[in-house]
Amino acid sequence: MSVISMKQLLEAGVHFGHQTRRWNPKMKRYIFTERNGIYIIDLQKTVKKVEEAYRTMRDIAAEGGDILFVGTKKQAQEAIKEEATRAGMYFVNQRWLGGTLTNFQTIQKRIKRLKDIERMQEDGTFEVLPKKEVVQLKKELERLEKFLGGIKDMKGLPSALFIVDPRKERIAVAEARKLHIPIIGIVDTNCDPDEIDHVIPANDDAIRAVKLLTSKMADAILETKQGEETVTA
């Protein structure tokens, strides 16, 4: 039983690449043809690459590894948050803060601040503080939660990154490569596939395409967790 079908990919519009004038020649091997000035991705290759990525995600999760889902473009934000949460993993779906990986200690200090304010809100501290101060703290909490909420329980560096549109997330890609953290990525015809360890050639601009592929990666993680539950039961 294959992980994904050609029909699913077609229905989600995974095969539509970018305009031919906006392309990276390194993606040529994943392009099937050109139609009306748009590159059409070879979905047979996508099927194989999804299966490879699925196995990789499953193996990392089976070894107890954490995977960080990254996608800050509008088309990816919702799917990244939903699927990472469903899989019990971490995510960045707003702005990638420089140093999230390469300067993780500093990021952890910001996360500690986030948790401290949350605690103050929960234990009644807000009720005894001046109103003006509470307003400021709530604003700070909102901002920290927006950018760090998806990684606030991440204790250390992730074992791998799953990225939607490595061109958009080039800082995340650079940080992961510097630290030799493997990257699984949805790579469109305008991206450089050489920077990604496990390439999924696909349309990264259609919400349905991003949702479909991201959900398959979450399924891979959940498959191992269900296996663990069966063993413990």
Curated annotation (Swiss-Prot):
Signal peptide: none annotated. The keyword Ribonucleoprotein applies. InterPro entries: Ribosomal_uS2, Ribosomal_uS2_bac/mit/plastid, Ribosomal_uS2_CS, Ribosomal_uS2_flav_dom_sf. It holds the Pfam family Ribosomal_S2. One of its GO terms (molecular function) is structural constituent of ribosome. One of its GO terms (cellular component) is cytosolic small ribosomal subunit. Keywords: Ribonucleoprotein, Ribosomal protein. CDD domains: RPS2. Belongs to the universal ribosomal protein uS2 family. This is Small ribosomal subunit protein uS2. It comes from Bacillus mycoides (strain KBAB4) (Bacillus weihenstephanensis).
